[in-house]
Amino acid sequence: LNNAAITAQAFLDQGYRRVAILDVDYHHGNGTQSIFYERSDVLFVSLHGDPAIEFPFFLGYADETGAGAGEGYNLNLPLPAGSDWPVWSAALEQGCQAIDDYQPEVLIVSLGVDTFELDPISRFKLTSPDYLKMGERIRALNLPTLFVMEGGYAVEAIGINAVNVLEGFEQR
């Protein structure tokens, strides 16, 4: 099951007209992209490892922007191995600007903390304090927001990093 996609569709079924999904998991959200690729009622933004060297390999490239009615409503921000907070946060800023421009009524965050520097799967270099800043930036969108937990494989740090996102989000 794709919890972010199910939730987005549930919001639409309840009368919302514009939903944004921000996927910050290390791997591209290929399922979510495929579900909404030809639709304009959901903006999908994904920050992820470069699919030229990372799973899923066949989707997640920057030139995949949507099709048909969905053209322009899919934003992939693939990042190189070794991306740290300055690199990653620049992509987050680009994604947040696209979300702000789209003017959704609600935001769903596919929250993966497998971008952590000690995660055995990831090649990104985010630190635990970076997740506070991530939450703060997402909060600055000033949208009703639902977080859906995704990946994270540095077991001892998953809780710390997920809580840091939420604490950053709740700070005013």
Sequence positions of predicted segments:
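Metal-dependent catalytic neighborhoods of phosphoester/phosphodiester hydrolases
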Residues: D119-S122, V155-I160
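Alpha-helix N-cap/loop-to-helix initiation residues
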Residues: W85, A154-V155
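A short helix->loop->beta-strand "cap" motif at the edges of active sites that frequently abuts
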Residues: A140-T145
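Short, electropositive alpha-helical surface patch
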Residues: T127-S128, A157-R172
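Conserved alpha-helical scaffold segments that buttress catalytic/binding sites
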Residues: L1-R137, L166-E167
